[in-house]
UniProtKB/Swiss-Prot annotation:
Gene3D superfamilies the UniProt entry points to: Tetratricopeptide repeat domain
Subcellular location: Cytoplasm; Cytoplasm, Cytoskeleton, Spindle; Cytoplasm, Cytoskeleton, Spindle pole
Name the UniProt record assigns to this protein: Regulator of microtubule dynamics protein 1
Main localization, broad class: cytoplasm
TPR repeats: from-to residues: 163-199, 217-253
Annotated organism of origin: Mus musculus (Mouse)
GO molecular function: microtubule binding
Protein family (similarity comment): Belongs to the RMDN family.
Superkingdom of the source species: Eukaryota
Length: 305
């Protein structure tokens, strides 16, 4: 009934002319008197046209309903996958997470793609991953991160993982490319922080960027000066500010941030504060393989103090 009433409202009003008889002075039908059939004509074509219009409208309505349902279903499915992926990530299930997300590598969803970039990189970082497999995974991760950024430029996480993946690829492309990429990496880390100032990881990564260029060997600095008029540079003090800021935003969020606070204080010859942060890094619960490696490194550094 709802469809019929809506359909009728869309159709033009039907004007039915009744037979008219206008008599002249002689009592006969005037020349302009007409009958209803002459106005409407043959009713069969009209009925066919009306039926076709009704069916066309019904088809359009059905298409809209199906399309809307498909969009809702697809959105619900993506949200379900993302929730499952986040659970696996928080649980430290690196391989299960990768196996889940790799099924959707052709996805057009930016949120899903940056998570796949992260998962690919995490698999590459595993000690059991061969060097050949690692290289393939690193380049694939960059591709996923790039696509994520193209699909959702407003995503802080997409900027962050794109920068991380560019940095990883630099290990295979030589010192010149690595230094040139440093400008791009910094730009995307800064954008990630701008979009989400409460993301401790992005702040931590800016600290790593500063730490890396603060400890750059003299020969690399020399190459950088030859290749670039204004090569990237930083200081341990600047790195320290970022590491502390990350800790303020989210205390004890990452074992590596604790380790780097200790290492940065060592570079600044402050052994007391270095020991404080290294002890925290050593005692950090080991949820991942990286956490275990950091525990070992922190213990070794403490032994040398």
């Amino acid at each position: 009934m709802a469809l019929s009433s809506r359909l009728w409202r869309r159709l033009p009003p039907l004007r039915v002319c009744q037979q008219t008889r206008t008599w002249g002075s002689r009592g006969r039908c005037g020349a302009w008197g007409v009958r209803a059939c002459e106005v409407i004509g043959n009713t069969r074509p009209f009925k066919r046209g009306f039926l076709f219009s009704a069916l066309s409208y019904l088809g359009f309505e059905t298409y809209q309903i199906i399309s809307q349902a498909a969009v809702v279903h697809a959105t619900a499915k993506v949200e379900e996958i993302l929730a499952q992926a986040d659970y696996l990530y928080e649980s430290g299930e690196t391989e299960k997470l990768y196996q889940l997300l790799i099924q959707y590598k052709e996805s057009e969803d930016g949120e899903l793609l940056w998570r796949l970039a992260r998962a690919s990189r995490d698999i590459a970082q595993l000690s059991k991953t061969s060097e050949e497999e690692k290289k393939v995974l690193v380049y694939e991760a960059l591709d996923y991160a790039k696509r994520a950024l193209e699909k959702k430029e407003s995503s802080s996480a997409a900027h962050k993982w794109y920068a991380i993946c560019i940095s990883d690829v630099g290990d295979y492309e030589g010192i010149k490319v690595k230094i040139a990429n440093a400008y791009v990496i910094k730009e995307h880390f800064e954008k990630a922080i701008e979009l989400n100032p409460k993301d401790a990881t992005s702040i931590h990564l800016m600290g790593i960027w500063c730490y890396t260029f603060a400890e750059m060997p003299w020969y690399q600095r020399r190459i950088a000066k030859v290749l670039f008029a204004n090569p990237p540079s930083s200081t341990y003090e600047e790195a320290l500010r970022y590491f502390h800021k990350a800790e303020e935003v989210d205390p004890n969020f990452y074992s590596k941030n604790l380790l780097l606070l200790g290492k940065t204080y060592l570079k600044l010859n402050n052994k007391k504060l270095a020991a404080f942060w290294l002890v925290k890094a050593k005692g950090y619960p080991a949820h991942t393989e990286e956490d275990k490696q950091i525990q070992t490194e922190a213990a070794q550094l403490l032994t040398g103090l």
